[in-house]
């Protein structure tokens, strides 16, 4: 997959989505992925910051961008029911970006992952 992206005639990226571990992010980076997502949304804020910062520092050292998640999106993909979803506080998001230097954020704003009935 990485080789196909590198040989494409148009710009292409290879992205690791929703990794919950530093080790898996590092494996993807070693394989040549252009971007990774570290999903520490299941962790307390401070632990999510520490994990994300560790991934960002390693990834940025080799030119790889990083997405992180803050809050809990409802839906099939994350295994969260609507009742357990947690909307991201904008002040927490700003602080998180400042502390981690992450490139992109997945935030919970009342949206959901996965399938919608009737769509």
Predicted regions and their residues:
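Alpha/beta enzyme core
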Residues: 1-11, 18-119
